[in-house]
């Protein structure tokens, strides 16, 4: 019979820290906020195996039984602070199924099979081995070939492992320290060894040898062999086999599947210049581009600088990327000036206005490009608050710059661009918040065109671009390089044009 647990599963930062300490998996997607912000997820992702341990902890006690087999599908990313509903099916005495859901969207599916057993080792024993790696391996795609095999020796950190077992009350549920240690090993291997730094765990299936639950030497570490069975290069998917032993005796074996996330390719400076050209046509003009450190914003800033424009490029936290862009653009006829700040903060916008007037005396172009990270959501009770928060945040990141700076643009009879999306015409499922936000900022542009008739207001709707927003194994398929769209936009901005209430600009 299937039932929903009365309380949701919720992960806090301390849970991620405890898991990392126990497993030695310190992959930056899970632990570094700065790194995670540069991915499609926009923030730290909860370890998949941590989710599996939490799901096992919601089973009924299993007296006289021990975990024999476990399969887990990590169906979607999990995040800190979100309450995940727990659906448990224990209709079979030796099999249990658990789903973690964010509303209707399943983020984890787990099936556990048990065997009759006298006991499981409830607490880890022995000394921790030094972790083989303290930094995740970063293999190039060319090195990920079928037949690759890795071997090693592993031991979870005993005190942290004991704390994890207690945190989720696993021992009464037939999950002992050796079971948990094998799961932590799987997380470590995927996140730190293969594929390593770019890993996104997809699923696992493990069979546990009964003799390994109470080995003759409880202090013995796990010896492991990980073999890469197949690589699916289109999606960066790796299929792997894992075998472990304790003091020479088989312990756990199974299959692991993970994606090697593709890093975004560096923007092609040559391709951008070939598409947009180089001149001094915008010499003396000043532009402000929000969200300019990466992706489309960086390409727009680059294209403007190629024609002599002084570009103030804002960023929230990507200082290194902004400084690197400034260095790249130092050879252009224009200039790129990084400016840290939150585009949705009125105090920041007021200070930016004062700086613009004091240092430049004008603003000719305003490009409202910044937007929040995007998570999939449905229109349902579990998502309602996050939908409204996303829309409010998105609107602020356009409304605040327009409110504080548009009159400066109008004084120069310049242009203000609001970056929308083709999704407003063809809305994808799971993006109600994104589509609503883009429709709202388009409406702001229409009203702004009425309020400031001396400024040329433009709304652009890019197609799917290869930026962090879509850089997942499936999402990146058929995405276009942002520099090509940026080139088309800047070429159009350089053409003469009169203000109009027909603000949507079709760029093809």
Language-model-derived ranges and their functions:
Residues 345, 371-388, 430:
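Conserved mid-core segment of classical short-chain dehydrogenase/reductases
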